[in-house]
Amino acid sequence: MAGAKEIRSKIASIKSTQKITNAMEKVAVSKMRKAQMRMAAGRPYAERIRQVIGHLANANPEYRHPFMVEREVKRVGYIVVSSDRGLCGGLNINLFKSLVKDMSGYREQGAEIDLCVIGSKGASFFRSFGGNVVAAISHLGEEPSINDLIGSVKVMLDAYLEGRIDRLFVVSNKFVNTMTQKPTVEQLIPLVADDDQELKHHWDYLYEPDAKSLLDGLLVRYVESQVYQAVVENNACEQAARMIAMKNATDNAGELISDLQLIYNKARQAAITQEISEIVGGAAAV
């Protein structure tokens, strides 16, 4: 059995770590709430522009933008949204597993893969795993700006317009609730009709100045807004996952301290018993 002094040292060390994890949990709670507010603020725009684009796709306007035309898939692009920091449980690993599974399906069909990686963890993963990373950005901070993302997104959009990729996906975590974050792979382009929103309103649209000018700008904004929303939502997922991870670490530290305290008490009791026995034995010898 370890000595009392050694056990006291371990208890002190774990208590110090527990204070750190407890503080990190509280910080994550605060950051998660702010991220949720940003996520909620961006959702109406992202959802509304998706509805408008969906209606345009279903309505089959005279001008068919390349983003709305299906073609044979020879090369696939993924915009991967990961975190810059760790200590958030299996958030990134679960996301990468979903991505690798989806990539494997296309590779089996003979398609090549191009990657645009957002976040340091994604860049680190693909350095080890391998992959053709054509664009990367990291350290966007707690309040990412859409302007910071435009350059990397444009690389993938230009590749699609030039025929270098035939399908583009965004891969990120969806915020279900504080306890649940779901990795998702969503197709950005070509646009697919949303059956849930199909012709809810049988409206006819008049395009000014014309459908081509409208769609050329609107579709690019659509992709940018979806990627931005994915980044904001992934940040909320990161903070929620970190909060849970730090809470579990704090609770585990408490249990470990209790176990060590019990061991310490037993060791101390054994030492006292031994001292008493030695005193009694010495007195008897006298």
Swiss-Prot record:
Main location: membrane
Pfam families: ATP-synt
InterPro entries for the chain: ATP_synth_F1_ATPase_gsu, ATP_synth_F1_gsu, ATP_synth_F1_gsu_CS
Spans traversing the lipid bilayer: none
Record key words, sorted: ATP synthesis, Cell inner membrane, Cell membrane, CF(1), Hydrogen ion transport, Ion transport, Membrane, Transport
Location within or outside the cell: Cell inner membrane
GO cellular component, one term: plasma membrane
Annotated GO MF terms: ATP binding; proton-transporting ATP synthase activity, rotational mechanism
Biological process annotations from GO: proton motive force-driven ATP synthesis; proton motive force-driven plasma membrane ATP synthesis
Membrane topology type: Peripheral membrane protein
PROSITE patterns membership: ATPASE_GAMMA (PS00153)
Family to which the UniProt record says this protein belongs: Belongs to the ATPase gamma chain family.
Subunit structure of this chain's protein: F-type ATPases have 2 components, CF(1) - the catalytic core - and CF(0) - the membrane proton channel. CF(1) has five subunits: alpha(3), beta(3), gamma(1), delta(1), epsilon(1). CF(0) has three main subunits: a, b and c.
NCBIfam families, alphabetized: ATPsyn_F1gamma, PRK05621.1-1
Annotated function: Produces ATP from ADP in the presence of a proton gradient across the membrane. The gamma chain is believed to be important in regulating ATPase activity and the flow of protons through the CF(0) complex.
PANTHER family xrefs: ATP SYNTHASE GAMMA CHAIN, ATP SYNTHASE SUBUNIT GAMMA, MITOCHONDRIAL
The protein's name: ATP synthase gamma chain
Source organism of this protein record: Pseudomonas aeruginosa (strain ATCC 15692 / DSM 22644 / CIP 104116 / JCM 14847 / LMG 12228 / 1C / PRS 101 / PAO1)
